[in-house]
């Protein structure tokens, strides 16, 4: 009860008769271009994520050193009054 080879061939012939070979060629090239664009976008996204992770890893170190500088300059007012 499944699709046999004969059914698939008849289906493809009907599709070619309805759309024509030129239109099918255009659809195929458009689909190929879309797939290529998607793959390129995924590669760019991976690079961007890696750059963001590296920047995020470097950020806490800079933040800690800034906090240490602030801590050395703070004065505990309550300690002086006691």
Swiss-Prot record:
GO terms for biological process: protein transport by the Tat complex. It is found in: Cell inner membrane. PANTHER family: SEC-INDEPENDENT PROTEIN TRANSLOCASE PROTEIN TATA. NCBIfam families: PRK02958.1, tatAE. Belongs to the TatA/E family. The chain crosses the membrane at residues 1-21. One of its GO terms (cellular component) is TAT protein transport complex. Keywords: Cell inner membrane, Cell membrane, Membrane, Protein transport, Translocation, Transmembrane, Transmembrane helix, Transport. Part of the twin-arginine translocation (Tat) system that transports large folded proteins containing a characteristic twin-arginine motif in their signal peptide across membranes. TatA could form the protein-conducting channel of the Tat system. The gene is tatA. It comes from the Bacteria. The lineage of its organism: Bacteria, Pseudomonadati, Pseudomonadota, Betaproteobacteria, Burkholderiales. GO terms for molecular function: protein transmembrane transporter activity. The Tat system comprises two distinct complexes: a TatABC complex, containing multiple copies of TatA, TatB and TatC subunits, and a separate TatA complex, containing only TatA subunits. Substrates initially bind to the TatABC complex, which probably triggers association of the separate TatA complex to form the active translocon. This is Sec-independent protein translocase protein TatA. It is a single-pass membrane protein.
